[in-house]
Amino acid sequence: MSRYDDLFARLDTAGEGAFVPFIMLSDPSPEEAFQIISTAIEAGADALELGVPFSDPVADGPTVAESHLRALDGGATVDSALEQIKRVRAAYPEVPIGMLIYGNVPFTRGLDRFYQEFAEAGADSILLPDVPVREGAPFSAAAAAAGIDPIYIAPANASEKTLEGVSAASKGYIYAISRDGVTGTERESSTDGLSAVVDNIKKFDGAPIFLGFGISSPQHVADAIAAGASGAITGSAITKIIASHCEGEHPNPSTIRDMDGLKKDLTEFISAMKAATKKV
């Protein structure tokens, strides 16, 4: 069984959904990012979605885009990301690690090398937010060869053909978005129609569904679980907490001015979000 299979079996027994934080690697530095990731797991995160910094993050709103920039200002590289994943995997051998990486990275490194490197580092899945499922065949093939679960996005208003393709191609989980647009708490998740979004995907008997985009409160998490999702992913709300503790101006590197304060704020937020995954 994969780490995702083990996670879903455990959560089903506990009557819970998954809470998955998105955290940018190297934001604002590799060491500080590792402390943030460790805090998230200790606070109750069930799995991780880790970002690899990129200069043109088209799927991300301003909050997450700024985290890409902070990481790049600090000298972030793909090689550094791989080393950070290895460290997280060594510290947390059972936690599923999903990656969010823009498609230029695998093109630059070569698909087979790219997926093999991330598999060897300890990643379980990779989502390329700018690669739609209709263009995904070569990525899925390279992922399968490396033992990585490919993840595709199920858009909120997708056609049945697209949802069928996403359900067939996604392994580990399906990333369903609760509304169209870019990531961010600037536009909160709409809870209207969440059940329809989930039900439309479930018709095709694919992997468990995680809902994301604009999930920023315990109520959003509870609504996602009530709608039939197996979990919820939160990125921008967590990134805002991190940013509020950063000091430094682009293009200079940033640093966390009060790590203990950041850990406290993250723990409170993530604990509340995880508590909201309890099925009623």
From Swiss-Prot:
Q: Name one GO cellular component term.
A: cytosol
Q: Which UniProt keywords apply?
A: Amino-acid biosynthesis, Aromatic amino acid biosynthesis, Lyase, Tryptophan biosynthesis
- Reactions the enzyme catalyzes: (1S,2R)-1-C-(indol-3-yl)glycerol 3-phosphate + L-serine = D-glyceraldehyde 3-phosphate + L-tryptophan + H2O
**CDD domains xref list:** Tryptophan_synthase_alpha
Q: Which residues form the active site?
A: E49 (proton acceptor), D60 (proton acceptor)
By its UniProt entry, which InterPro entries does this protein fall under?
Answer: Aldolase_TIM, RibuloseP-bd_barrel, Trp_synthase_alpha_AS, Trp_synthase_suA
Gene3D superfamilies (UniProt xref): Aldolase class I
Top-level division of the source organism's lineage: Bacteria
Annotated metabolic or biological route of this protein: Amino-acid biosynthesis; L-tryptophan biosynthesis; L-tryptophan from chorismate: step 5/5
Identify the EC number(s). 4.2.1.20
The molecular function GO annotations come to:
tryptophan synthase activity
Class of enzymatic activity (EC top level): lyase
Q: PROSITE patterns annotated for this entry?
A: TRP_SYNTHASE_ALPHA
Any Pfam family the entry gives: Trp_syntA
Kindly state the subunit structure of this protein.
Tetramer of two alpha and two beta chains.
Function, in words: The alpha subunit is responsible for the aldol cleavage of indoleglycerol phosphate to indole and glyceraldehyde 3-phosphate.
State the family named in the UniProt similarity comment for this chain.
Belongs to the TrpA family.
Q: What is the protein name for this chain?
A: Tryptophan synthase alpha chain
The species this protein belongs to is Corynebacterium glutamicum (strain R)
Per the UniProt record, the lineage of the source organism begins with: Bacteria, Bacillati, Actinomycetota, Actinomycetes, Mycobacteriales
